[in-house]
Swiss-Prot record:
Domain EF-hand: 11-46, 53-88, 98-133, 142-177, 186-221
Biological source species: Rattus norvegicus (Rat)
UniProt xrefs under Pfam families: EF-hand_1, EF-hand_7
GO cellular component: axon; calyx of Held; cuticular plate; cytoplasm; cytosol; dendrite; GABA-ergic synapse; glutamatergic synapse
Annotated protein name in UniProt: Calbindin
Origin organism lineage: Eukaryota, Metazoa, Chordata, Craniata, Vertebrata
Positions annotated to bind Ca(2+) 2: 111, 113, 115, 122
InterPro entries xref list: Calbindin_Ca-bind, Calbindin_six-EFh_dom, EF-hand-dom_pair, EF_Hand_1_Ca_BS, EF_hand_dom
């Protein structure tokens, strides 16, 4: 099925989902190693079989990743390579998803109750707003289809809602700083202890200076994952979740807490 979709001159949103599912064999949300090489090989075979030239985007993609063992792409990168239907592709090209800081601000707008999740109706409004900002409108049926596909693409634990880290897969891999923090998340007890330690004045939130101290210590302890030279970027992106410069426990937990275990 993936081969026939790769032969198409225009790939629908549903076909794109099937292609992604086919190649993301381990369900990690990214294509890397053998998965990525399989995609490149099947793409080349499918286009040749259909008598179609590689598009400029495909050529660039093959040149960039064809000979690399360490390549890694997300859904966003694949959406830019394949000839995906215009309105669906716009969801991956909007300005709000060009940088992690803008993404965090957008998340704050929709996660109004600080629950750490965006549910189906909120996601639908989020996608609708993105399309409207690109001067595109879709009917309710198509919007529902896009919402359903986004949940299928990003909802890795199948709970019908998206966590921040799941939603962040809308960002290009190079922009997704949250990936850096995946390996250093703390259990709930450790996180609460750390929050109370760095909330030095005990006012229930962490300000920019307190966050700076926390990040410096994290960088020192996790040199393989975090680069101390990037502290200002980490801080700017995390503070985009704050409420007027106040970073509450639930907000910081989205970045640093792995849950209650």
């Amino acid at each position: 099925m993936a081969e026939s979709h790769l032969q198409s001159s225009l790939i629908t949103a549903s076909q794109f989902f099937e292609i992604w599912l086919h190649f993301d064999a381990d369900g990690s949300g990214y294509l890397e190693g053998k998965e990525l090489q399989n995609l490149i090989q099947e793409l080349l075979q499918a286009r040749k079989k259909a008598g179609l030239e590689l598009s400029p985007e495909m050529k660039t993609f093959v040149d960039q990743y064809g000979q690399r063992d360490d390549g890694k792409i997300g859904i966003v990168e694949l959406a830019h390579v394949l000839p995906t239907e215009e309105n669906f592709l716009l969801l991956f090209r909007c300005q709000q998803l060009k940088s992690c800081e803008e993404f965090m601000k957008t998340w704050r707008k929709y996660d109004t109750d600080h629950s750490g999740f965006i549910e189906t109706e909120e996601l639908k409004n989020f996608l609708k707003d993105l399309l409207e900002k690109a001067n595109k409108t879709v009917d309710d049926t198509k919007l529902a289809e896009y919402t359903d596909l986004m949940l299928k693409l990003f909802d890795s634990n199948n709970d019908g809602k998206l966590e921040l880290t799941e939603m962040a897969r809308l960002l290009p891999v190079q922009e997704n700083f949250l990936l850096k923090f995946q390996g250093i998340k703390m259990c709930g007890k450790e996180f609460n202890k750390a929050f109370e330690l760095y909330d030095q004045d005990g006012n229930g939130y962490i300000d920019e200076n307190e966050l700076d101290a926390l990040l410096k210590d994290l960088c020192e302890k996790n040199k393989q994952e975090l680069d101390i030279n990037n502290i200002s970027t980490y801080k700017k992106n995390i503070m985009a979740l704050s409420d007027g410069g106040k970073l509450y426990r639930t907000d910081l937990a989205l970045i640093l807490s792995a849950g209650d275990n």
